[in-house]
């Protein structure tokens, strides 16, 4: 089964995808790669344990302000960062990662996550909910690192963030990037559309649009039938590659500069 990230990887360079996914070659680990994996791990642990916060009924009451909720989440995040770093001491030492710098980057990248959640918690508390009922009735509810799978599409993925608004009966997938983006690139469009399709199947309701949150820029993508067909065609094209084992060249050969797979790519033509 393909992963959503496989689709964007194939779009970037079919040959890189071929060597990674079909031949089984691996890129050498680098400091940025390890830092990225640690950031994703923090987000994953954050998402998996967020509901447990609301079991402490005494900590959440009708007098809890957004500022206090924000502090509540910040302390929660800080504990998770320490936990992930403690469990990854070997990698951190091997790749000479500055823990304090990475900690600040993670906190910065999670600022909006915490802000959105704090606003939602404050508004739901005002409706009289506390504790577990508060979690169950949060609206809008933001869920990070949500695993999704579709047997019919042959596709799976983990959405960076989704927003569920029960009042408006709306579900919105978000793709988060650290870089600013002037526009939605084809790879972003494929990822956003893929997550929308996976969510439509999971929740059995239409997903009209998705959002790319890239650095300080926000772009909205309307999910059309044409977008969906592009995803289906791409899935079929990639599945065909597993049979033919004849990958296409990238659309732009500037991508070949400093590519780890250059030697393997040249030997493929022999």
Where are these regions (language model features)?
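Charged, glycine-rich intrinsically disordered N-terminal tails and low-complexity linkers that flank
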Residues: 1-93, 135-137
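An acidic intrinsically disordered interaction segment
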Residues: 3-10, 148-167, 224-232
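Short alpha-helix boundary/capping segments
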Residues: 30-31, 183-190
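Short amphipathic alpha-helical face segments that pack within enzyme cores
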Residues: 38, 190-198
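Catalytic cores of nuclease domains that cleave nucleic-acid phosphodiester backbones
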Residues: 62-175
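Metal-dependent nuclease catalytic regions and adjoining charged, substrate-binding loops involved
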Residues: 151-154, 182-186, 198-270
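Glycine- and acidic
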Residues: 175-181
